[in-house]
Amino acid sequence: YEDPEKQTECTNFALLVSKHFSEPFKDSNGYGESIARLSNMLGGGVIVQRFGDLIRGRRSTPKRIEENTFVPTLSATPGDLSLVLPKRILDGIIEMIYALDKIAPGTANDDTLLYGVEVKFYNMEVDVDENLESRHIGDGSGVTHSLSHASASGVYVARKIAESLEG
């Protein structure tokens, strides 16, 4: 942040885990909504948990968060993400944190704070042609799932529109 009052020594980043369902799974949106409901049920919203507590299978308490090396930068309720996230998703997050720790030592520190959960929904039902053209504007197509992909998609489509106007 440019504003010194908002600066911290912490780095915030997001780990996204995609889940693609196959038959006979019928309601992927309902599945995601149930995860969000669990989070709200257990913490009233966003839950924060120390990485060390998660690995040890224990809930983070207000006291442990207060004594933590890092001060939370987001408003959240101390809790247990393992009561919200399915095991395979949680295993993927833990595996990624350990992998990041190899290139950014300290990422897998006991005091690293994890916030959750955020559930995103993507619609893959919208038809687009080979030039990514559809009757939809923006990322309503559900083709891109990140800011970088959406940006690249926008540049590509803008070039195609410019080409069609020239010729």
Where are these regions (language model features)?
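A conserved FAD-binding loop/helix module that cradles the flavin
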Residues: 140-165
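A glycine-rich dinucleotide-binding beta-alpha-beta segment and adjacent secondary-structure elements
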Residues: 76-144, 151
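Generic structural hydrophobic/aromatic packing signal, biased to beta-strands
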Residues: 13-17, 51, 114-116, 126-128, ...
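A structural preference for long, well-packed, hydrophobic secondary-structure segments
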Residues: 127-132, 159-167
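An anion/pyrophosphate-binding glycine-rich loop and adjacent beta-alpha core
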Residues: 1-80
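Solvent-exposed, non-transmembrane amphipathic alpha-helical segments
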Residues: 35, 71, 113, 117-120, ...
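Structural signal for hydrophobic packing residues in well-ordered secondary-structure cores
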Residues: 55, 59, 97-104, 158-165
